[in-house]
Amino acid sequence: MVKNKDHPFRKKWGQNFLADGNLLDKIARTIDPKTSDNILEIGPGEGALTERILPFVQEMVAVEIDPMLIKTLEEIPSLKSLNIIHGDILMQEIKDLPINDPVRVVGNIPYNITSPILFWLIEQLDYWEDAFIMIQ
């Protein structure tokens, strides 16, 4: 994985990335991705969790708000099949994303937007089967 050590964490987005490989492996095992899964990742950051899930699933879409991180994600060879959407997840509707539903939702989200994301998920119950949300 390409680590962008020069990436400035953006306070307005509450950025904080998972970096502990052992923890990431545990999270991926808990998610237990299957070849039939359609995964929607909220805020993939530098792609650390993404890399551990993408090889095992049918399709994966990641919604990222930070244009600098999109560039980083696009440069990671192991993420070539990842469909990256530039935008705010709260402005998206799962049914309009380029992924088949039901989706499995994963994300390591900033504390300051936890409630809005949980309400966003509740409003779209028909389009997802489970969610694995870590709160920073």
What is the predicted role of each segment?
Residues M1-I135:
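Catalytic cores of RNA-modifying enzymes
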